[in-house]
């Protein structure tokens, strides 16, 4: 995989996702072997178990996770075509979903605004992971929870088969459906280079979170990371 394919600026990533917005849901279904729907439901159940009033879904994309979580969610994304897909989806479902055009590296919210912040399949696309994590923590209230759902490298006896699928099937399906070879090559490649497991947990702790955990899903095809912003006086 070419190094330059993975060394993208925010504007390049923004344009790439804009080009594939109309096929993005299908890409996630393909990349996840159809499991992304159940993963989002799992995250939504975790959100429901947390005492919360306001939830921010960063990199909301077409709104799948925000709409699964339900009321009290604000969806933020820097890709306008994605937000338009989310708006149409929410209207079709007759479900309110406030949307905000925002870069995850410069969120337009005051500190300690949200009880829960979620990110699904977006954090590996941050142009600067350290800065992005700092922003996610900044907008969390003390005691608030960050939930990050992200693709990871499979483990166990099925790892070779699952790894082959992630590397080869989505790019071929994506090129066939959209003709955008670069975008569909980038997305699986970004999974293989993104820090995961203990490395990602260390990044969350460095950003200021405590009680950081990781839970592999479906043989490690995806992972759910969780951490809390310390209450006032415990930092």
Residue ranges and their predicted role:
Residues 1-23, 166:
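N-terminal, positively charged/glycine-rich alpha-helical extensions of SAM-dependent methyltransferases
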Residues 11, 149, 153-203, 207, ...:
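C-terminal alpha-helical "lid/dimerization" subdomain adjacent to the S-adenosyl-L-methionine
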Residues 23, 32-52:
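Conserved alpha-helix/loop element of class I SAM-dependent methyltransferases that forms part
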Residues 24, 117-118:
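Hydrophobic beta-strand segment of the Class I
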Residues 54-106:
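Class I SAM-dependent methyltransferase SAM/SAH-binding core
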Residues 105-117:
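A short acidic, Gly/Pro-enriched loop at the edge of an enzyme's catalytic core
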Residues 130-145:
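A short glycine-rich, Lys/Arg-flanked "PGG" loop and its adjoining helix->strand segment in the class I
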Residues 210-235:
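Core SAM-dependent methyltransferase catalytic element
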